[in-house]
UniProtKB/Swiss-Prot annotation:
Keywords: Cytoplasm, GTP-binding, Ligase, Magnesium, Metal-binding, Nucleotide-binding, Purine biosynthesis. HAMAP family: Adenylosucc_synth. This is Adenylosuccinate synthetase. Binds 1 Mg(2+) ion per subunit. Gene3D superfamilies: Adenylosuccinate Synthetase, subunit A, domain 1 (3.40.440.10), Adenylosuccinate Synthetase, subunit A, domain 2 (1.10.300.10), Adenylosuccinate Synthetase, subunit A, domain 3 (3.90.170.10). The gene is purA. InterPro entries: Adenylosuccin_syn_GTP-bd, Adenylosuccin_syn_Lys_AS, Adenylosuccinate_synth_dom1, Adenylosuccinate_synth_dom2, Adenylosuccinate_synth_dom3, Adenylosuccinate_synthetase, P-loop_NTPase. It comes from Synechococcus sp. (strain ATCC 27144 / PCC 6301 / SAUG 1402/1) (Anacystis nidulans). It comes from the Bacteria.
Length: 444
């Protein structure tokens, strides 16, 4: 048995959906532990491309229990839309469970999110406008609506009547927006409650029961380490904790049940929205990465900013999450390049810096120090074993593993499940501390 956390080692969009889908084959339970509809993941199965925002990737496996944990924030309309989409494709959602203590995104959250971002002007932070930040803010202020509140009609009416009256003052006085009709919102969300009710459980208890039966549990993070509220490029971050430690809080488990952490990173780097990005490319190579990598957001459709691989933030992600091994995705996107650059350190005001700075202002002043390596100029999308890769591609992977000080367990060479090289067992491999002690950081 192994309980594994899958996290993004960059700014999100690393390909966690595909990796989680692959690992879900050997999982009994998959738990999404944070975030909301601001995060999207894409899974390609045969000719079908599924884009999901809330439902865990493991939903494609009928024997895998899929749980939306208490650390998430749920937009019921979007969630039920995903359920309907899957059922129309003949994919059952009977094995989908929803934490009763997850918070609910309401219409006023979306309105406040969008109006607040617009009001920021040139100081915007790049929110998706889906109401995630305001939902988490209400959670912290202890005024939020939880899934279990939806299940209590009288309590919901009382709570929403008071809350909407308060939010209408904010909408009017602060943003100049028309008020919401409380009765309409109560009626709408009461309808959602009845459709969600069969899926609602005490998720912490459900996960504990699975653990006691020695089931394999996979914890699925959304977004990435550099978007973490506490450890990311603040203030250009999300409102939750995508890091591995967030899995315990967002799922309702103790840290001792986590056996392994798998970090997912692209073979280059992308970022959506605002914020510093030292290795960002603005010319032809940046455009090539964007087009070949289809770098457009699953949630918003926004064009992703593209740049070279940044080993400084990679090492930071390894440290913050305790990453045991890596899954490197989209290696094939680099196939046509004559040479590839990797950021190995930063120059800040003439001094070398090997570590990620906590200040966004300092990070914005970082100039990347690059190591240039040769490209391989041939297709890798057909490769299924390390031996099939061009030597330069294999050398590139080894270089990344050395810089990150963890082994590479999975290499993804395309969106399909079969476009994957399993280098070593990502679930049952040795712990990072042992690898570090032995000095073993190669990719093979």
């Amino acid at each position: 048995m192994a309980n594994v956390v899958v996290i993004g080692a960059q700014w999100g969009d690393e390909g966690k959906g595909k990796i989680t889908d692959l690992l879900s084959r050997s999982a009994d339970v998959v738990v999404r532990y944070q975030g909301g509809v601001n995060a999207g993941h894409t899974v390609v199965v045969g000719e079908q491309t599924l884009k999901l925002h809330l439902i865990p990737s493991g939903i494609l496996y009928p024997d895998t229990q899929c749980i939306i944990g208490s650390g998430t924030v749920i937009d019921p309309k979007v969630l039920l839309g995903e359920v309907e989409m899957l059922e129309q494709l003949g994919i059952s959602t009977d094995h989908l469970l929803i934490s009763q203590t997850a918070h609910v995104t309401m219409p006023y959250h979306r309105l406040i999110d969008q109006a607040s971002e617009q009001q920021r002007g040139s100081h915007k932070i790049g929110t998706t406008g889906r109401g995630i930040g305001p939902t988490y803010a209400d959670k912290s202020e202890r005024t939020g609506i939880r899934i279990l509140d939806l299940m209590d009609p009288e309590g919901l009416r009382e709570q929403l009547t008071w809350t909407i009256a308060q939010k209408n003052v904010i909408l009017d006085k602060l943003y100049g927006l028309p008020p919401l009709d409380a009765e309409s919102v109560i009626e709408e969300y009461s309808g959602y409650a009845e459709r969600l009710r069969p899926h609602v459980v005490d998720s912490s208890l459900t996960i504990d029961e699975a653990w006691r039966k020695r089931k394999n549990i996979l914890f699925e993070g959304a977004q990435g380490t550099l978007l973490d509220l506490d450890h990311g490029t603040y203030p250009y971050v999300t409102s939750s904790n995508p890091v591995a430690g967030g899995a315990c809080i967002g799922a309702g488990v103790g840290p001792t049940i986590i056996d392994r952490v798998i970090g997912v990173a692209k073979a280059y780097t992308t970022r959506v929205g605002e914020g510093p990005f030292p290795t960002e490319l603005h010319g032809d190579i940046g455009e090539l990465l964007c087009q070949r990598g289809a770098e457009f957001g699953t949630t918003t459709g926004r064009r992703r900013r593209c740049g070279w691989f940044d080993a400084v933030i990679g090492r930071y992600a390894v440290r913050i999450n305790g990453i045991d091994c890596l899954a490197i995705t989209k290696l094939d996107v680099l196939d046509d390049l004559d040479e590839i650059q990797v950021c190995v350190a930063y120059d800040i005001d003439g001094e070398r810096c090997d570590h990620f700075p906590s200040s966004a202002r300092s990070f914005a002043n970082c100039q990347p120090i690059y190591k240039t390596v040769p490209g391989w100029k041939q297709s890798t999308s057909h490769c299924r074993n390390l031996e099939d890769l061009p030597k330069a591609a294999l050398d590139y992977l080894k270089f990344l593993a050395e810089l990150m000080e963890v082994p590479i367990a999975i290499v993804s060479l395309g969106a399909s499940r079969d476009q994957t090289i399993i280098v070593e067992d990502p679930i049952h491999g040795p712990k990072r501390a042992l690898l570090h002690t032995n000095g073993d950081s190669s990719a093979s």
